[in-house]
A protein has these predicted regions:
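A phosphate-binding catalytic loop at a beta-strand-loop-alpha-helix junction
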Residues: 1-4
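A short, conserved acidic/glycine-rich loop-to-beta-strand motif
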Residues: 127-129
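Conserved N-terminal catalytic core of the sugar/cofactor nucleotidyltransferase
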Residues: 6-10, 14-123
Length: 129
């Protein structure tokens, strides 16, 4: 993947000509009726950001949700890009806390799959995971 992602984010990789790899995770979320989605981008995110600007494809509600895109904030105190998924979540905890959602789904934007996140959530609740 290194060669493929030198000039674009992995989530923006074309799949079958008209899709991007992130489309599968976003479609899964939309089909699972998730209304508020945060995307944490890191580097080479221009083409991914351009693609995400057309978020009408996934119909994330604007009144009670929406599609939120976060890039790393590099400051004098923090000169790092995200150092993995856990760090991206940690640096954006304020978004998660202010969302007032009882549950959060964390999914990768570089995998191609179809999943009903409601079934996953039901299982986790049932097992008290």
């Amino acid at each position: 993947m290194k060669e493929l992602s030198q000039k674009r984010a992995i989530g923006a990789m074309p799949i079958a000509g008209s899709y991007r790899s992130i489309d599968f995770s976003l479609s899964n979320m939309s089909n699972s009726h998730i209304q508020k989605v945060g995307v944490f981008t890191q580097y080479n995110a221009r083409s991914l950001n351009e693609h995400l600007n057309s978020s009408k494809w996934w119909d994330f509600g604007r009144k009670q949700g929406g599609l939120f895109v976060f890039t790393p904030t590099v400051t004098a105190d923090n000169s790092y890009w995200y150092r993995g998924t856990a760090d991206a979540i940690y640096q954006n905890l304020s978004f998660l806390k202010s969302s007032h959602e009882p549950y959060v789904v964390i999914a990768s934007g570089d995998c191609v799959y179809k999943m009903d996140y409601n079934k996953v959530l039901e299982y986790h609740i049932e097992k008290k995971a």
